[in-house]
């Protein structure tokens, strides 16, 4: 049942059917799932609700993400916090840290793409249109390289 509903969720997300996607997230998040499925679903829901600028649901999911343990849990929680601060709280005080993280990302195009996008948004929040456009373009170039 979970796999079928998860596929249905992905279909709603692809079609941008937000009403049904919300309903499916509510259903799936209410299930008692194995740890790895729960982690995957919570992160997917967090990314969705941050993109929808849903402050309440994003905050609840971020709180759960911060409780994850093992593996890359701490790094994932930190990156989710940066996303929340940037996209929900509209902050721009993480620019130096994001630039440092971008340098450390090296040849990791997926990570670079994500960090450049967050940097673009932080510069937008700051009101620096030129830097916003610069990092948005870089993010787009890495995105095309990743999807090629």
Predicted regions and their residues:
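Residue-level signature for tetratricopeptide repeat
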Residues: 11-14, 47-48, 84-88, 122
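Long, hydrophobic alpha-helical segments that serve as membrane-spanning/inserting helices
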Residues: 117, 121, 126-148
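Heptad-repeat amphipathic alpha-helical coiled-coil interaction surface used
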Residues: 8, 45, 102, 119-120, ...
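A membrane-cytosol interface segment of integral membrane proteins
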Residues: 38-55, 59
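Soluble extracytoplasmic domains of inner/organellar membrane proteins
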Residues: 74-90, 96-98
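N-terminal topogenic membrane-targeting module
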Residues: 1-38, 61
């Amino acid at each position: 049942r979970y796999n079928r509903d998860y596929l249905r969720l992905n279909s709603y997300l692809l079609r941008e059917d937000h009403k049904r996607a919300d309903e499916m997230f509510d259903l799936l998040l209410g299930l008692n799932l194995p740890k790895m499925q729960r982690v995957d679903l919570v992160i997917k829901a967090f990314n969705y609700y941050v993109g929808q600028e849903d402050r309440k649901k994003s905050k609840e999911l971020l709180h759960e993400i911060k409780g994850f343990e093992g593996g890359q849990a701490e790094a994932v929680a930190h990156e989710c916090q940066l996303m929340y601060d940037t996209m929900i709280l509209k902050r721009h005080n993480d620019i130096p840290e994001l630039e440092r993280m971008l340098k450390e990302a090296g040849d990791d195009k997926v990570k670079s793409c994500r960090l450049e996008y967050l940097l673009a948004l932080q510069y937008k929040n700051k009101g620096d249109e030129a830097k916003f456009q610069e990092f948005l373009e870089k993010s787009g170039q890495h995105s095309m390289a990743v999807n090629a």
